[in-house]
Amino acid sequence: MRVGLDIGSTTIKCVVLNDAGQIVYSTYERHFSHILEKGRALLEKVAAEYLPDGRAYLAISGSAGMGLADSCRVPFVQEVFATRVAANRLTPGTDCIIELGGEDAKILFLTNGTEVRMNGSCAGGTGAFIDQMATLLKMGADEMDKAAQSATRTYTIASRCGVFAKSDIQPLINQGAQAGDIAASIYQAVVNQTIAGLAQGRPIKGNILYLGGPLTFSRTLRQSFDKTLGVTGTLPENSLLFVALGAAFYADEESDLREVAKRLDNYSAAATYVSLPPLFADQQEYEAFHARHMKATVPCLPFGADCGPVHIGIDSGSTTIKLVVIDNNANILFESYRPNLGNPIPLVKETLLKLYRDHPGLQIASVTTTGYGEELVKNAFHCDRGLVETVAHFTAAKHFLPDVDFIIDIGGQDMKCFKIEDGAISNIFLNEACSSGCGSFLQTFAQALGYDVKEFAALGLFADKPVDLGSRCTVFMNSSVKQAQKDGASIENISAGLSISVVKNALYKVIRASSPEELGRRIVVQGGTFYNEAVLRAFEKEMGVHVIRPDIAGLMGAYGAALYGKAKAGENARSTVLTEQELAQFSQKVNTVHCQGCGNHCQLTVNVFADGKRYISGNRCDKPVTGKANNEDLNLYAYKLKLLDGYRSTPAPAAPRARIGLPLCLNMYELLPFWHTLFTRLGFEVVVSPFSSRSLYQSGQATIPSDTACFPAKLSHGHIHWLCEQGVDAIFYPCMSYNLDEHLGDNHYNCPVVAYYPEVLEGNCPELNGTRFLYDYFNLERRKDFYKKFQQSLDKYFPGLDKKAVREAIDAAYDEYHRHMQQLRDKGSEIIAAARAEGRRIIVLAGRPYHVDPEVNHGIDQLIIRQGAAVVSEDSVSWHEQKFQTSVLNQWTYHSRLYAAAKYCTENPDMDLVQLVSFGCGLDAVTTDETREILQAGGKLYTQLKIDEITNLGAVNIRLRSLFAALEERREVQAPLALS
């Protein structure tokens, strides 16, 4: 008999084979991290029921199996090898295996030797991710699969991280999208993540095998893979057990299973892990801590007829709805905290009706809304005002600590931090790349270990040796936890370690503080996560100060909104909110349409209410609402696109020498005027790829070799694919280490991705095999060399070009480039002058030349225009500055412009900078800190927007509105500065 055990990140699988290789017993169950106990129970059961003498050939495999194999001295077989053994035996001729597990994803290429690709730093697109999404849709995994079968369309959803997929999905739920469409979109996101992130440019073809839980249980997921890959994959019998079967086939050592189980029973690891000091020295210290935090309270009074006028604050969050009623003395009369179940409107209606019915004659002086659903709730119920959530939280914090200088709010899946200087918000931090410092992080672990989250948190309070877990992705922290368990850590010490890691992640990953002291000394902590006393204590210990944790930590947004409404309402105010009679007649209808008003083609959600009032969301300009588009006269991004589009409509020569393609990506956004002019003058017909789109991105997705490349680089694969489909004679996309020197920095390099990505395209785009691809190295700064180098390069492909004609074409190209850049500078100056004449704020939307691509910036420029500001770019103002000293090596042209633009903003009171950062950009780890320092040294706010393929702009909108609210607040606090 043969026995194979596969212990994965979330499940344990076991197979028993008879001498003919047939399965006589198999099991597949979750282990909830109780690996030793489950393993022992399985071995005892198999020995008792299937092995009369207790002996069998035994091997163990799986991502969590090595520790168990070591503990009981049994052979361990690596899971990739076990999978290959099983595939060779059971499905010979397999070319490729796609396996999705609970927290890991793998692609095994078996043709021409074995090659394996596994997920590295992120567990998006795995079984755990699908489970999270099913929970969000209030479905089981089976129900989600069934719902997806009825889908009629798909939406763009990030599978990079469960939390950020939530930020894409939650608005769709709120906007009334069909559950089946969302479910199908989730499966498609998993497919995209697997192909782009794991295949890394290697084609997936031939006989394909699907393995692992998600692919076994979801027919829709298999169909999505089949459709995207253009093949029909096979789901083999016993697909869940392949690794266990491989281990059983591989086993070459006979073991006594009863003896092995006994070894596990006697196994007790010494506590050898790295530990941290306990949260509390003793019970007395805890009681003093508990008593101190019970003082930050808001009086809650009975809600009677004599309460007078009341003020209501409604915080419509991404997953919850909070409502607070206060009197004129800021006492709480009523509070409500409920999950919004995807649509806040019915819950708000229900709560308002309850207030009217329970309190006849109720006088409502003001209703103020805040949060993600602020505008929707405000418009639906005719509330008096909306308030951006950062200001709502700040207003509430000031009530508890008037001279507060730092606020941190940790919710279930988001984190907000504000620095306060001179009574106004001076800096805002949001988690943009990872959720491992949020409440859902602890909840995930509590559930995985079989505990309620409150019970789990309480376990850690008196842990004697908390595990040092560092701060990592939610999913990959699991491996740290398993290792700690193997090393003898108790559940109590793991709970305490996780609470400490939440705090460290918030401070050092999100805020990126170099030391706790720089954040502040008068701190208010908010959000539901701080009800967890272990997290609260860990935060105080890490910061070295006592903090204020209000007893309404989870209601601070709603409370702040109510306070703000009270302050603005004035004497004898009466709210415009719907009356009891109007609420009884209230109804809401939701439908989604694509706006055809401009090239953005925004997906609009139209809410129609019983009184005929409409609320439209999802629009990036005002055209769907007012019938008029945004005023593009004050938008330099729109002007840049218009100039670039002009080159596409240039007529081709009558008898072109050849058709040459230019991919409009990365540095081509800056150098298109140069190359287009050069080739046109030489008699070529120039074919320029279009501005990027979702479909163009997906057309090149299969050839992307690494998921770590920035989104603008990934887009270039689609541009190459498009040009090849046009049948051009050649594609020209040179490698360029250097830019033209603008004398703003110590050197004038391109970043490595921009400089050398043509090499990556040449090596990974099979369609280039049928098209000449010209990607020689050029340096435009060395003009004399360039004449010669360019002539030599072109002669290889198009011999016989006249030297004089080439020189004249090059001279014309330089002239056109300089003319184009001067046009941008002149237009920037014109916009700034016009904005000043109208008293508008001016935002320098700073990034790289390719951030003007609509698919990259997602219309963020339009959002800023909607706030009533003007938009210019970094290259339209950087020329005002001379080279200056920076604290980092200033050697990249695009970054030199960024630093110069930041400095220019500090010299102009009506200008502020918003930095666009592409997710995954390594150099921006440096530039963001330097830009922040330059701006803060000049008394300016720093705002960073991280962007990639995610198109939902809810968080971006909040960020921008927070900036404008903070600027307005500063203007009120300080006397206005005179313009220089």
Give the ranges of each region predicted by the language model:
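Short glycine-rich, Thr/Ser-proximal phosphate-binding strand/loop in the N-terminal lobe
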Residues: 4-45, 115-116, 120, 314-354, ...
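Glycine-rich phosphate-binding loop plus the immediately following alpha-helix
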Residues: 34-35, 112-153, 240-243, 249-253, ...
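Glycine-rich phosphate-binding loops at beta-strand->alpha-helix junctions
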Residues: 64-65, 198-228, 239-243, 370-373, ...
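Conserved phosphate-binding/catalytic loops in two-lobed NTP-binding clefts
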Residues: 76-80, 226-245, 384-391, 540-559, ...
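Glycine-rich phosphate-binding/hydrolytic loop that grips phosphoryl groups
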Residues: 85, 127-132, 237-271, 395, ...
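Acidic, glycine/GT-rich loop-and beta-edge segments that sit at the periphery of enzyme/chaperone cores
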Residues: 106, 253-309, 416, 567-632
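An N-terminal assembly and electron-transfer interface module characteristic of large anaerobic redox
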Residues: 119, 123-130, 329, 434-442, ...
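Adenine-nucleotide phosphate-binding core of ATP-dependent small-molecule kinases
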Residues: 165-196, 479-508
